[in-house]
């Protein structure tokens, strides 16, 4: 047990240790694999604890400085968990489809966010009623689309300082954009992933809801604690 209350028993219970089928492995994950059981790779939870602690320390210290975080997880097992934990920790999030250029084409995304704000303002005063039926319908459809894909980053005013990625394989486009821009990443890496592509790889089962939730809670709690520490510091 350590300062972030990361213990092996909890990780076992959440199924964090279960990797993919051995035949699907990435050899770069060898240092993080404990064994093979019935054709399934078993993740070394000591390594998971080590990197999760490192990630929590980084997030805590970064949150103290008031930095911005983005959580990306669009697979069905993760989508609602991403939204829930991100809102609790006041992080930005993407839990639907990742739109290419969300980070690398930030100027265009900012314009879309402005459009989202304009349409929501219009909706709040029943402004759609002023338009012909067909035009109002188009505007409502546009608003629904913008909310769906950009709702989680509506308050993002600049590129994030750190991006947390739930499934490296599933979110490869997002990861590549971070690499291009030099944005640090923390990634869940299952046994079929490439740990070299991320700044802090967390070896873990990225398919189990319990595993995703357990690790996400640790990461976002460290952000919340960092922000609380910052507030207390400014009061003293």
Curated annotation (Swiss-Prot):
It holds the Pfam family Ribosomal_S2. Keywords: Chloroplast, Plastid, Ribonucleoprotein, Ribosomal protein. It is found in: Plastid, Chloroplast. GO terms for cellular component: chloroplast; mitochondrial small ribosomal subunit. Its main location: plastid. One of its GO terms (molecular function) is structural constituent of ribosome. GO terms for biological process: translation. It comes from the Eukaryota. HAMAP family: Ribosomal_uS2_B. Belongs to the universal ribosomal protein uS2 family. This is Small ribosomal subunit protein uS2c.
């Amino acid at each position: 047990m350590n300062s972030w209350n990361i213990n092996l028993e909890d990780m076992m219970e959440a199924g964090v240790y279960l990797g993919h089928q051995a035949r699907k492995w990435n050899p770069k994950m060898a240092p993080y694999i404990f064994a093979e059981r019935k054709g399934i790779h078993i993740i070394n939870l000591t390594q998971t604890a080590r990197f999760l602690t490192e990630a929590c320390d980084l997030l805590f210290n970064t949150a103290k400085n008031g930095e911005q975080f983005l959580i990306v997880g669009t697979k069905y097992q993760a989508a609602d968990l991403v939204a829930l934990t991100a809102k609790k920790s006041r992080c930005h999030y993407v839990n639907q489809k990742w739109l290419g250029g969300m980070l690398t084409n930030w100027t265009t995304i900012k314009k879309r966010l402005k459009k989202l704000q304009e349409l929501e303002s219009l909706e709040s005063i029943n402004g759609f009623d002023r338009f012909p039926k067909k035009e109002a319908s188009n505007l409502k459809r546009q608003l629904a689309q913008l909310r769906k894909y950009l709702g989680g980053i509506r308050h993002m005013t600049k590129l994030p300082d750190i991006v947390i990625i739930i499934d490296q394989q599933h979110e490869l486009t997002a990861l590549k954009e971070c690499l291009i821009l030099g944005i640090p990443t923390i990634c869940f890496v299952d046994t079929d992933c490439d740990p070299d592509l991320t700044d802090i790889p967390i070896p873990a089962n990225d398919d189990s809801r319990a595993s995703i939730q357990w690790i996400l809670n640790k990461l976002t709690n460290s952000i919340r604690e960092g922000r609380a520490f910052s507030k207390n510091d400014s009061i003293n």
